[in-house]
């Protein structure tokens, strides 16, 4: 947009994301995102936004406690402390989806692969391409073709 305050806020958010990103390993979200960009030509950041909730769900079994810790910065101290520990990871995912929907609505961005005009017939090619992406080596949960297809199918219609 043309609002300088909004542009500065986005630049600062991008900087903070870059600092955080440079000290972490990526996984299924980036693997699917790289493949979707290569096959369907959607922007990388948009792909990351679409796949983030699905990647969190996929890694929930092996990273439940870590995902649950994200609830504190996403929802605030009161909500975090009043949420039972065993529910925090699921609440984190719900909060991430809620925030994603608000951002997409505010910015007019698509929230699903279908809204991003990805052709459903491209999903198999995206899944096969993703399986060759090196980012999957560091994902906590191994990704098979059937898993990739489930994630892509879910991301096609759902936030």
Predicted segments — roles?
Residues 1-98:
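Active-site segments that bind and position negatively charged phosphate/pyrophosphate groups
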Residues 53-159:
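Mobile late-domain/C-terminal helix-loop "cap" segments
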């Amino acid at each position: 947009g043309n609002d300088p305050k909004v542009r500065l806020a986005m630049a600062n958010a991008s900087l903070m994301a870059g600092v955080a990103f440079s000290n972490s390993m990526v996984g299924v979200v980036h693997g699917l995102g790289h493949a979707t960009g290569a096959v369907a030509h959607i922007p990388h950041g948009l792909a990351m936004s679409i796949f983030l909730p699905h990647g969190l769900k996929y890694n929930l079994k092996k990273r439940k406690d870590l995902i649950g810790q994200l609830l504190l910065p996403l929802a605030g101290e009161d909500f975090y402390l009043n949420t039972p520990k065993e529910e925090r990871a699921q609440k984190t995912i719900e909060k991430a989806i809620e925030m994603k929907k608000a951002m997409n609505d505010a910015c007019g961005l698509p929230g699903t692969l279908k809204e991003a005009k990805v052709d459903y017939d491209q999903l198999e090619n995206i899944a096969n391409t993703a399986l060759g992406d090196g980012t999957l080596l560091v994902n906590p949960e191994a990704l098979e073709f059937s898993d990739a297809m489930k994630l892509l199918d879910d991301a096609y219609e759902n936030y």
